[in-house]
Amino acid sequence: MKKALLALSFVLCATLAMAQYRNKDGNRIGITGGVSQTSLFNSNFVTKPGIGFNGGLSVRGNYYNNWSMIYGMQFFQNKFSIETTTSSLQKKESEFNIQGAQIRLLLSYNVVKNHVSFDFGPVLQINDKLKTANSDQNNTITGTNLKAVQLEEISKVNGNVYVGISAGNRRIRAIVHYQYGFTNLLNKLNSEEDLVLLNNNTKFKGNLGTISGQLLFNL
């Protein structure tokens, strides 16, 4: 996982450097950072959204008339809670977190040039395991016979759809965007028949939905 993230970082940095070198006026390199709220949409568990964070780099280039393209990568940590039952039979919202990197290629329509844009496109997500606190790992997922720790091995490569809007000037912009995961984050769990049985003999299905607020600083 770490090697993959380092490779992705190298590719992005090299691409951004080349873009800036080739056309300093047409391309803008930006640094972003912000907070996110993530929900796990599924019919297996009782869940609640949680607060995470993200940050990364991007390059915006002129494309055609009022259209631009954005290529970027960001690192993220998303969080959400799943209702569990402790060994003392107490209900508890156990927090889970997922970390990884995303590569996105977006089309951007300049509603007001250099000030307001509408952005959309696909996102490739590479993430680590689904993790929870050591103290919660043996809690039972409400409505199932699963232990929290048994949800760790999720799908590592996922795809999202990105829709967002940004507003500001050439140097600083505020960004609000939403991502929906169109792939099944929990699909890898379906390869383990024992886990499916513990899940009431029901296939696992879960899609992430994340809304983020960010600040972008153009170099």
What does each model-found stretch correspond to?
Residues 1-28, 32, 215-219:
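Bacterial Sec-dependent N-terminal signal peptides
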Residues 20, 116-121, 125-127, 175-179, ...:
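Membrane-proximal, glycine/serine-rich, low-complexity loop/turn segments characteristic
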Residues 24, 62-66, 112-116, 170-172, ...:
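Outer-membrane beta-barrel channels and translocator barrels
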Residues 28-30, 68, 106, 115-117, ...:
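Membrane-spanning beta-strand positions in outer-membrane beta-barrel proteins
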Residues 31-35, 53-61, 73-75, 103-109, ...:
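Residues on the lipid-exposed face of transmembrane beta-strands in outer-membrane beta-barrel proteins
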Residues 39-48, 77-99, 126-162, 183-193, ...:
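Extracellular/periplasm-exposed beta-strand and loop segments of Gram-negative cell-envelope proteins
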Residues 47-89:
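Glycine- and aromatic-enriched membrane insertion/assembly motifs of diderm outer-membrane
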Residues 90-115:
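Helix-adjacent hinge/juxtasegments
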